[in-house]
């Protein structure tokens, strides 16, 4: 890749429902293409930078030179990425399924031994 970017991340989503649909599924994972696109747009070959980073102008200059794709976020790191993705996906899943399905958690992996989980605490 020709762009400066961070490390590889993995994402795990856990969905929950009080009852299964007519196919005996919690959620049809074939409907997850919009989630994949969101993850690619925000995390694939991107440079995630905290919106308050004092060097933001430097990062933007790299982007202007075609050296990076900068994604501004309110905090960075696996913990914040898990929270950020959860807050994007959860309401859409709830709306898409007429509140039948809830996003229970998002886990973000840095590599095999490190991860952070953001949990839905509304249903605990």
Where are these regions (language model features)?
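Charge-rich, low-complexity N-terminal segments
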Residues: 1-124
């Amino acid at each position: 890749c020709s762009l400066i970017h961070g490390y590889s991340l993995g994402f795990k989503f856990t969905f929950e429902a009080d009852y299964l649909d007519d196919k005996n599924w919690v959620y049809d994972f074939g409907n997850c293409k919009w989630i994949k696109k969101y993850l690619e747009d925000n995390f694939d070959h991107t440079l995630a930078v905290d919106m308050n980073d004092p060097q933001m102008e430097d990062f933007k200059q790299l982007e202007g030179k075609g050296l990076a794709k900068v994604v501004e976020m309110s905090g960075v790191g696996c913990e914040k990425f898990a929270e950020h993705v959860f807050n994007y996906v959860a309401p859409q899943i709830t709306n898409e399924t007429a509140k039948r399905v809830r996003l229970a958690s998002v886990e973000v992996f840095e590599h095999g031994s490190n991860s952070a989980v953001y949990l839905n605490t509304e249903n605990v």
